[in-house]
């Protein structure tokens, strides 16, 4: 049996054994459970050479032949990069959760939910058939509901989880209608075949209907204005969930969908007007709300809303350089945002608060956490020598030199939004650690190894990917941009 087929089920198998493993080994069970996503990461790495040379991999099995429903997968630069982010960062999140949830009576259940969430997101980005894609899309909503509402005895957690489920679940039904329209217009129900049917779809009188329905699904999942409200409220979830949700998983599912469909649905007036309009608005709204917060997680959550808006804006802008900037920024954001959320979790876990007005002077007590924070903030701010610098240089260039009528406005919005994100990033990285020591609810000390591995490795990855930019471009950003554009770059 194909190993890739089995890879779809590995996270769910790990989820089944997570409770007994955590009961038997305690928090150290995280090391054993992390082997599952680590194996998947290595498996997907095996596709890098072929994908880097412009190859695409498809495969699968017939499921319901009478309805042309297959269990099929499609691996190209876009899906492979997402799969590597999901499993690579997922490995670190499992380790982090082991330390963060140490001693919690339900840590086994929590690990099980995290692994199911990972499996749902991995399946979503690798699915070729529309049916498989929709099943995994809705499964991400269900598993995120379980994670956001993990503290089910708290009214606020239950309300936030329900809100996220209603918004994203309803968006999924809207998306299903859009996929059915696309299927009826083009006669294909697999993404790998749809990419060659773009002219048929764009010329159809049903294009606008499909476009609006697809956007309904994508905008709910990726928290675009005015549907952004559920994402900050999801911060009621434990920090490992927040870090994973914002760096590599569900909130980028909508962006993934738009990037996947760009070759087939892009290059129209509707696409190149609506996406920059809503994306740019979301970018500005997110950053303005971020600078008004004092809670570390809320500050980072609103900058995620802003970053998702930036990615949608660039995806809709339509030029090759803008797309290249978008894919560079997507990867960079996954690295620095995952690290910063784990930093916020370390501070909250060890000091007892994440209110920046009640924090200060932690540098001598948490030097490793501070190191990860400052490197990640430098990347978030778009400063050298981090990969965030490469991403922001590329995206500014991609919109500023364009002859598109929106170019000047989009450039101004991108600069304004990123300037505010720069401020937020350094407030998160500096305020808790510098200045005079502030009395905190708990006697602060450095986080345990399980909680340091994630932020340190992601911060180092932000540096290494910039230093080794030729390899980074060859194996990651270039194949991904080619998949989004629909031709080699």
Please give the residue ranges for each predicted region.
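Transmembrane helix-loop-helix hairpins at membrane boundaries of multipass inner-membrane proteins
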Residues: 1-5, 15-112, 184-202, 229, ...
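Membrane-embedded helix-loop-helix hairpins and adjacent transmembrane boundary segments
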Residues: 2-10, 39-42, 49, 405-408, ...
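Hydrophobic alpha-helical transmembrane segments of integral membrane proteins
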Residues: 7-8, 15-16, 33, 222, ...
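Hydrophobic alpha-helical membrane-insertion segments
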Residues: 34-48, 168-179, 373-381, 454-471
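Membrane-interfacial helical/loop segments at transmembrane boundaries in membrane proteins
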Residues: 57-67, 190-198, 394-398, 471-489
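Hydrophobic transmembrane alpha-helices and their helix-loop junctions in integral membrane proteins
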Residues: 92-133, 142-447, 467
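Short phosphate-coordinating micro-motif centered on Lys-Gly-acidic
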Residues: 138
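Hard-cation-handling environments
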Residues: 445-489
């Amino acid at each position: 049996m194909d190993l890739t087929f089995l890879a779809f089920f590995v996270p769910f198998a790990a989820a089944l054994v997570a409770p007994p493993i955590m009961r038997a080994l305690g928090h150290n069970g995280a090391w054993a459970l992390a082997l599952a996503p680590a194996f998947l990461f290595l498996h997907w790495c095996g596709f890098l050479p072929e994908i880097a040379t412009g190859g695409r991999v498809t495969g699968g099995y017939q499921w319901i032949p009478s309805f042309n429903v297959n269990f099929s997968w499609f691996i190209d630069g876009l899906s492979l990069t997402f799969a590597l982010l999901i499993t690579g960062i997922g490995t670190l999140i499992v380790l982090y959760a082991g330390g963060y949830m140490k001693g919690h009576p339900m840590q086994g259940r929590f690990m099980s939910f995290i692994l199911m969430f990972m499996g749902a997101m991995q399946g979503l980005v690798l699915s070729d058939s529309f049916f498989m894609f929709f099943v995994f899309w809705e499964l991400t909503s269900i598993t995120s509901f379980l994670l956001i509402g993990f503290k089910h005895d708290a009214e606020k957690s239950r309300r936030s989880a329900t809100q996220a489920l209603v918004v994203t679940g309803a968006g999924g039904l809207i998306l299903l209608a859009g996929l059915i329209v696309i299927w009826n217009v083009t006669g294909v129900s697999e993404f790998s075949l749809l990419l060659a049917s773009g002219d048929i779809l764009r010329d159809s009188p049903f294009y606008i209907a499909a476009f609006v329905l697809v956007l309904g699904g994508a905008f709910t999942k990726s928290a675009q204005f005015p549907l952004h409200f559920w994402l900050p409220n999801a911060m009621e979830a434990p920090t490992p969930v927040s870090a994973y949700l914002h760096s590599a998983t569900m909130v980028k599912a909508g962006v993934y969908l738009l990037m996947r469909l760009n070759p087939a649905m892009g290059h129209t007036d509707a696409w190149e007007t609506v996406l920059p309009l809503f994306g740019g608005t979301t970018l500005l709204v997110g950053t303005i709300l971020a600078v008004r917060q004092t809670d570390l997680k809320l500050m980072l959550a609103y900058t995620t809303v802003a970053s998702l808006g930036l990615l949608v804006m660039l995806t809709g802008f339509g030029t090759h350089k803008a797309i290249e900037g978008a894919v560079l920024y997507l990867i960079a954001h996954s690295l620095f945002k995952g690290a910063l959320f784990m930093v916020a979790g370390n501070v909250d876990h060890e000091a007892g608060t994440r209110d920046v007005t009640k924090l200060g002077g932690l540098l001598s007590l948490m030097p490793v956490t501070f190191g990860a924070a400052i490197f990640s903030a430098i990347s978030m701010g778009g400063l050298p020598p981090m990969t965030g610098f490469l991403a922001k240089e590329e995206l500014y260039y991609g919109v500023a030199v364009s002859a598109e009528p929106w170019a000047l406005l989009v450039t101004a919005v991108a600069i304004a939004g990123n300037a505010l994100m720069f401020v937020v990033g350094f407030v998160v990285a500096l305020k808790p650690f510098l200045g005079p020591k502030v009395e905190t609810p708990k006697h602060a000390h450095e986080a345990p190894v399980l909680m340091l591995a994630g932020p340190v490795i992601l911060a180092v990855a932000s540096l290494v990917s910039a230093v080794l930019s030729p390899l980074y471009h060859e194996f990651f950003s270039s194949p991904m941009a080619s998949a989004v554009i629909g031709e080699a770059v």
